[in-house]
């Protein structure tokens, strides 16, 4: 897996809309960015995925699954993990190449390579792999005999003495996450949602489900996406607003040896002497493998930055509403008023390191400064579940994940029997207890009120509602109306944005709402998971689903995708889905 790590990130991000090239950008990255990559491009290699697949094939073919220690099967978890990893690797091939050779036998002789294996597209790959994986649903990943929270150290980088560690269990991918991802790509939204729910209720580390993050903001000291400082009128002075959310700073997810929120990752070695290294940190301007002599700053940042946040991402971050409690001298309850600030979303800013250089400012993206290649985070999976719910027509459930998160409060009612969460339908509330049983009698204790956070609150402040027993200081009664981040309002704003951008007649049908919320989820994925290797696949998947829905004419998905990426000046017409794939080699 370490051999494919750099390619995974660059294939996923360079063709997306969240990074831009610089004077120092490698030509291979430039070619990916403008869709001119040929089979000579060093980041276009199906081989690195097939190498993983063949290793898995070999293990699966030769593993004796009847090995027991007493009544405990001591190998089945690793056997399942090999099948999940193989499916994940095929999923990446299906995303990047239109059709790929498919085989499940181990290739041990050169003569086997020339066999006429069937070439399958992504839907056929899912059809081949998913039925076998279904029998392993709800199975945990291997722990290799150590505590799931345990960190093993693997040496230190040359420029610092602090040891780098990794979590062995997080080097595997839960089978339900792979199944959910495959079904979502294939447009089987019900199966995708069921498997994501199974992951959260049967597999996920329970402490992760109750971890809260917020990019906690301090006025007039937070770097804006454009490199300047927030003006005085962007937010009231500190004594005029209240910190309404608690929890760990969101950027700690990407800190040294963190495991919270991380489901699966590829930890890279701290030095060449310790194993396989990665070039990803250096591409973003951080020389993780510098010697102490090469460290010219407090940390080994370099001036030759190859990738920066795109103007689109900076604009999205800066234009996102930030919500805060306003307090007044004569106000009885300082938590009655939630206001909108022009300060923007805090997540991008919390992973940007900035230093002055003369009259300009230099910015570095810090997500990779500890050489961890993230594959899945719980936050990512919640957003994929929101995407599936939305396409199932459960638009309110999708918004719940953005605004409030999943918690017992969803089932709460006032004395007169009316629900606390007024924007949820009775049908959705019932589905969350039965069909997608996050809040069934068996599972509801996994999601306590006090630790429920909507994903949007990670960076946008007081987007959530208040509820009895909740984390908010003003949570005496449940009130969905305090924060301006409301379902109807946000959908209306997004509909107007789409109408203006694409010149389409946006109506008030269910499909119009689904499309608008899908774009809201797309924005949230940008703010939450930027630079993690997902973006091209998110855009491509959503464009495909828009086309399949038939909304706004025959090829709205293609037009939507092409417009988002027009700033990259692609050399091909991205309205044509045939141009969405890399040349296979």
What are these regions (language model features)?
Residues 1-20, 573-585:
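Acidic, glycine-rich segments characteristic of secretory precursors and extracytoplasmic regions
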Residues 49, 154-167, 263, 267, ...:
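Long, intrinsically disordered, low-complexity segments
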Residues 40, 201-418, 423-428, 463, ...:
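Elongated scaffold/linker segments in the mid-to-C-terminal portions of large proteins
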Residues 20-100, 116-127, 133-134, 138-140, ...:
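Conserved, well-structured interaction surfaces
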């Amino acid at each position: 897996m370490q051999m494919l790590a750099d390619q995974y990130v660059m294939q996923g991000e360079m063709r997306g809309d969240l990074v831009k090239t610089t004077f120092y950008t490698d030509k291979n990255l430039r070619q990916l960015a403008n869709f001119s990559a040929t089979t000579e491009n060093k980041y276009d290699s199906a081989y690195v995925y097939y190498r993983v697949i063949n290793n898995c094939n070999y293990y699966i073919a030769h593993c004796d699954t009847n090995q027991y220690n007493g009544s405990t099967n001591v190998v089945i978890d690793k056997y399942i993990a090999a099948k999940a990893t193989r499916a994940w690797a095929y999923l990446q091939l299906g995303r990047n190449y239109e059709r790929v050779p498919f085989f499940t036998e181990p290739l041990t002789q050169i003569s086997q390579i020339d066999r006429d294996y069937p070439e399958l597209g992504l839907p056929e790959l899912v059809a081949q792999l998913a039925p076998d994986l279904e029998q392993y649903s709800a199975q945990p990943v291997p722990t290799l005999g150590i505590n799931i929270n345990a960190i093993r150290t693997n040496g230190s980088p040359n420029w610092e003495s602090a040891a780098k560690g990794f979590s062995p269990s997080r080097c595997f991918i839960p089978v339900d996450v792979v199944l959910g991802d495959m079904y979502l790509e294939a447009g089987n939204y019900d199966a995708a949602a069921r498997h994501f729910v199974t992951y959260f209720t049967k597999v996920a580390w329970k402490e992760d489900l109750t971890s809260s993050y917020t990019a906690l903001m301090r006025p007039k000291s937070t770097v804006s996406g454009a490199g300047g400082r927030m003006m005085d009128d962007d937010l009231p002075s500190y004594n005029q607003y209240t910190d309404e959310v608690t929890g760990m700073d969101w950027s700690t997810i990407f800190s040294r040896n963190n495991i919270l929120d991380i489901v699966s990752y590829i930890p890279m070695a701290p030095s060449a002497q310790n194993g396989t290294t990665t070039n990803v940190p250096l591409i973003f301007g951080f020389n993780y493998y510098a010697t102490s002599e090469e460290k010219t700053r407090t940390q080994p940042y370099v001036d030759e930055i190859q990738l920066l946040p795109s103007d689109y991402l900076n604009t999205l971050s800066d234009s996102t509403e930030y919500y805060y409690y306003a307090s007044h001298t004569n106000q009885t309850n300082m938590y009655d008023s939630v206001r909108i600030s022009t300060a923007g979303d805090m997540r991008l800013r919390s992973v940007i390191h900035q230093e002055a250089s003369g009259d300009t400012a230099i910015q570095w993206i810090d997500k990779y400064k500890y050489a961890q290649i993230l594959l899945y985070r719980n936050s990512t999976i919640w957003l994929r579940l929101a995407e599936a719910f939305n396409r199932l027509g459960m638009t309110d459930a999708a918004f719940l994940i953005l605004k409030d998160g999943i918690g017992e409060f969803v089932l709460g009612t006032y004395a007169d029997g009316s629900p606390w969460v007024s924007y949820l339908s009775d049908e959705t509330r019932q589905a969350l207890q039965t069909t997608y049983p996050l809040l069934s009698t068996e599972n509801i204790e996994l999601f306590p009120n006090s630790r429920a956070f909507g994903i949007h609150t990670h960076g946008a402040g007081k987007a959530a509602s208040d509820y009895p027993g909740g984390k908010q200081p003003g949570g005496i009664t449940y009130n969905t109306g305090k924060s301006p981040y409301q379902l109807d309002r946000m959908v209306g704003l997004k509909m107007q944005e789409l109408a203006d951008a694409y010149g389409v007649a946006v109506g008030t049908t269910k499909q119009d709402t689904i499309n608008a919320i899908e774009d809201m989820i797309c924005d949230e994925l940008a703010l939450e998971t930027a630079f993690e290797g997902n973006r091209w696949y998110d855009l491509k998947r959503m464009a495909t689903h828009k086309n399949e829905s038939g909304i706004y004419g025959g090829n709205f998905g293609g037009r939507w995708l092409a417009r988002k990426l027009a700033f990259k000046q692609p050399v091909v017409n991205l309205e044509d889905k045939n141009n969405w794939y890399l040349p296979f080699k």
